Amino acid sequence: MNDFNYRRRHSSTVQIGNVPLGGDNPIRIQSMTSTSTLDTDASVAQCRRIFDAGADYVRLTAQGVREAHNIGEIRAALHAAGYTKPLVADIHFNPKAAFEAAATTDKVRINPGNFVDAARTFKKLEYTDEEYAAELEKIRRAVVPFLAICREHHTAVRLGVNHGSLSDRIMSRYGDTPAGMVESAMEYLRIFREENFNDVAISIKASNTVIMVETVRRLVAEMDREDMHYPLHLGVTEAGDGEDGRIKSAVGIGTLLAEGIGDTVRVSLSEEPELEIPVALKLVDYITAREGHAPINGCFAKAYNRIAPERRPTNAVGSIGGQNVPVVATALSPADVAAIATKPDFFLSDVNWKAVDASDKSEGFSDDDVLLLTSHHANPVGEIEAFIHRLWDNGCKAPVVVRMSYDDANEEDVQVKAGADFGALLLNGLVDGIVLDAPNLPNNADAVAYSFGILQAARRRTTKTEYISCPSCGRTLYDLQHAVKEIKAATSHLKGLKIGIMGCIVNGPGEMADADYGYVGAAVGKVSLYKGKECVERNVPQDVALTHLIDLIKANGDWTEPKQ
């Protein structure tokens, strides 16, 4: 068995307009508009910007039949201007809108969590097996006519499962779990297969990269068991903006791409949608460049759980390994990092490392060694993983710190590449620390900040405030980008606090399930505020909402004054 070589998962081909997905086609790139779908001119202009940036597909929200119909008008205007790539309608809660969109767009995204099932209320529902089967039959009665319209108009479908919008029915039987997310998709896929409708792709997303990666792996395993090979759409929902959003997306998406999983990618940023495209292109190009590399021999360790990995057991050498959080070390000097807030745990000169290249096949390592592991392979993550799995199977518990170097001078390039590489190693539980060398960055110390950002994005260590912010869409009725910047500026000193900033209620309360506080769009220029899952204040005007949010944080004892 050979577990560490890059090769794409085999998937079936789905025809989406004039840009097919899956099979031997390239990994496709997409984004979503943030304009009102009823504003034809603004939507056309934004679609053009997204396509000009390099997107293969653009998705537009369709809250109702009017919006779904108008996507057809937008499509016609784009075609008249020479833009013929596919448009996708995004549907939640409204099957009638999906029926209309099936006749006006190239693909319709439906959400199994709310296409037939009511919006989630977080209530526990009790079903007998017979009652549960009746609910599935209700889904079939709604889905089959929809598929008939799609078939008539040669319209593809995406089943888009979101962690934040699982139905109460699924939650009651499976819990708020990866298994529940997978079953939410499989219920629909089984109907699609029985109806011989094959132009379907699947996404299964979460804002938590650990859950997102585990769930996609579970879905692939379940589809393999049932001999399904539908193409997969990858994304981390509510990844945020700036450095954090790019790193978090690279950690989640990059980990799966490196395993050969994924046929289309959307990097969700709380920014203008066309800015998502270069990030996605860089990520896909970086991973797919590994194709055809020199073979890496090795197998997963016997104790390794490839679906939901736990951390490799290691010996604690000082504060490295064992039960210690993964460390950040640097080759920079103390003077180089004097100005940054969170200092590295170690300078390379502080520790008696045992430097090893991952191509080394020797086995003479002590449990008291701290291995500083590097790779010069075209697929460095694969070679590093093979080395560590060999250690594991040989019973060696020496902690491993991985050092990787990037020659790029562009900050985004380093964020994407390092996020994908270190993110995979961290999510797979294989490393006890990281060293990120980026000597050509304008500010060398940024490499240390990126290192801590990667650890936090992989849910391995928290060193700053966590923001769960969505990219906005046509459902968002307030200035989300401004709100994100404003909230970050006021709360970024609250280390360890999680704040959700969401455009609307589609995923809002659900994706914020583990957030401490939430700021969710409610109406034009108004938001609702949450403490955990509980809405504590509704319809707050945006111009005073930040003050109300800070007051809420203070009232619950989570506020500290920023240091001057």
Enumerate the predicted regions with their spans.
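Hydrophobic or amphipathic alpha-helical targeting/insertion segments
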Residues: T84-F122, D129-I149, H153-H154
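Glycine-rich phosphate-binding active-site loops on the catalytic face of alpha/beta enzymes
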Residues: D56-R59, T105-T121, E259-E274, G429-P442, ...
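N-terminal amphipathic alpha-helix/helix-capping segment at the start of soluble metabolic enzymes
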Residues: M1-S31, L147, R151-H153, A289-A335, ...
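Active-site mouth loops of central-metabolism enzymes
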Residues: D24-A42, P86-N94, R169-V182, T237-I247, ...
